[in-house]
């Protein structure tokens, strides 16, 4: 018999190549000679310990940590202490009014990016603060307060829109309207 008829294995060009794919290599393929092999978990342990010590260090009290409002702690405010007391909410609204007055210089320099960031930061918690601060007011003044608060929210959203475009005249116009409406809200809370 010929060798062509008795072969049990197929020819090499018909064989399917077997690819073994490693998902995670246990060590780096390229390494320098003379240096010890780096443990795979070294970076993870370092990062975990850094985050742990940062959180523990952040738990200590300082002047900024005692302050219950401000731009430095907006992540903490939004996710870890969303519900302030009505007095704290009123104080944060007053501080927002002062911050909006200080924003004039950013508008004069036309640094729109910072203005947008500041407006959106304040808008994020202002509606909740306005609702919380309403509990301080007597029933007879609440309707007027709600109208002033709605006007403030509307003016801030218009200011945000015109700063995004950026239209200079309209931005200044709604900036002044926002200042006027936040002053009306602060009058109710005083």
From Swiss-Prot:
Transit peptide: 1-31, 32-68
Superkingdom of origin: Eukaryota
Keywords from the UniProt entry: Chloroplast, Coiled coil, Membrane, Plastid, Thylakoid, Transit peptide, Transport
Result of knocking out the encoding gene: Impaired chloroplastic NAD(P)H dehydrogenase (NDH) activity leading to the loss of post-illumination increases in Chl fluorescence, probably due to a reduced stability of the NDH complex.
Subcellular location, record wording: Plastid, Chloroplast thylakoid membrane
A molecular function (GO) term: calcium ion binding
Biological processes, Gene Ontology terms: photosynthetic electron transport chain
Membrane topology: Peripheral membrane protein
GO terms under cellular component: chloroplast; chloroplast thylakoid; chloroplast thylakoid lumen; chloroplast thylakoid membrane; extrinsic component of membrane; nitrite reductase complex [NAD(P)H]; photosystem II oxygen evolving complex
Alphabetized Gene3D superfamilies for the sequence: Oxygen-evolving enhancer protein 3 (PsbQ), four-helix up-down bundle
Family: Belongs to the PsbQ family.
Function statement: NDH shuttles electrons from NAD(P)H:plastoquinone, via FMN and iron-sulfur (Fe-S) centers, to quinones in the photosynthetic chain and possibly in a chloroplast respiratory chain. The immediate electron acceptor for the enzyme in this species is believed to be plastoquinone. Couples the redox reaction to proton translocation, and thus conserves the redox energy in a proton gradient. Required for both formation and activity of the chloroplast NAD(P)H dehydrogenase (NDH) complex.
Protein name, per record: Photosynthetic NDH subunit of lumenal location 2, chloroplastic
